[in-house]
């Protein structure tokens, strides 16, 4: 689902923050920021490609904050089926498999993020999900009764799960 831009991960500081919100009617909105500290004045950091089949639901812009440069994608109105296609924002996205599904009244998030190729120990990689109801189980950190966050560690594979 969310993407990690792996090209700049091997050098310099990296920031990838992705967040999603799931509505009661199974519509997903959120934001992805992929940025790095520029190597020189011409370095724009990670860049997203907004040529998606549902491009009208995604807005891509430049990101420049706190000494980091890159891209920001804001999306809304995505279905559970469209969500994994966000990885197509970058040809460098790799090792990410996150999905949402509904089972009766439960919304279930399952995912796997492989950061074994990330050598930047200082990388700040987070993923958070806000659900339409109370989270009943998760292997992430509960930020609120309906919000879970994962701090993804460089060099390892992380699995994520949550039910609401």
Question: Which positions does each model-derived feature cover?
Answer:
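Sec-dependent N-terminal signal peptides
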Residues: 1-4
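N-terminal Sec signal peptide cleavage junction
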Residues: 12-13
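Post-signal peptide N-terminal segment of mature Sec-exported envelope proteins
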Residues: 22-36
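Post-signal-peptide N-terminal segment of Sec-exported extracytoplasmic proteins
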Residues: 37-62
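Residue-level marker for the onset of beta-strands and adjacent loop->beta junctions
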Residues: 16-18, 146
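Mature, soluble, non-transmembrane domains
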Residues: 57-164
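Buried hydrophobic packing residues in well-ordered domains
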Residues: 18-20, 26, 127
